[in-house]
Each structure stands twice: as C-alpha cells, then as structure tokens.
C-alpha cells in the first residue's frame, strides 16, 4: 500500500489522563488506522514531536525547522506522504514547505494528507472530491493507483 508516515503530533494523544485512548510513548492507533485503510505505516523519528504549533506566528523560523525535522525523518524512512489529524499541523507541514525547501536544500518536498482524505479514498470517494487542489505540495498523483489504498479482508 501507499507508504504513509503517521503524525500524531503533540496533541492527538495528550493529555493522557483525560484521553487515555493509546499509549502516549508508543502509540499504535494511527498506525492501525493507516493499515485499516490499506496504507503501509512508516515508522520514523519525531512522529510525536511538536510541528511548531502556534509559534508559527511569533517564531516562524522555529516552526519551519521543527516541521522540516519531522518531514525529513519521514521521507528518509521511505514515506510517500505524511498523514495528520490537526489543521495547524497541516498548515505548518504543507503550507510551509516553500520556506522549508528554501532553508533546507536537501529537502525536495513531501505531500501532507489529512487522515480523512485517506479514509474517504479507501471508502471509494473519487480523488477529485478529496480537496487535493488545496495542498501546497501536490498529492493527487498518490491517488492514481487505487490498489495502493484498497482495503483487503
């Protein structure tokens, strides 16, 4: 299947006491989700590190650096894309990629997807309905081969 790096970030599983839906230090819920929609989860460093969150307003360079570390680690481990749950994570990792590529010449770019786009694709929604045209990093080619995300019993 499509090799996707799950990005839990700093908020999906925290605070643990209130949420308690997965092990915060070794989460599996996002990996399990990706497998259930036919993707191959990619393990990588920094998958639970903060992407820069709200400091993207006051310290954009710090958010650019944080997002670069996450994206580059995912890419170096073979990810074709990274999946997020948070709109701010999407902004920092997708919309900031022009700044990331400018600051880090070794980074060619990596598509960023919402987990809901992968779910919709797996459920048979046409790629033209996934909102991919809103992405700063083109992602539509990832959805050309339906077999990459087919759910197999």
Report residues per predicted region:
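Iron-sulfur cluster-binding electron-transfer modules in prokaryotic oxidoreductases
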Residues: 1-153
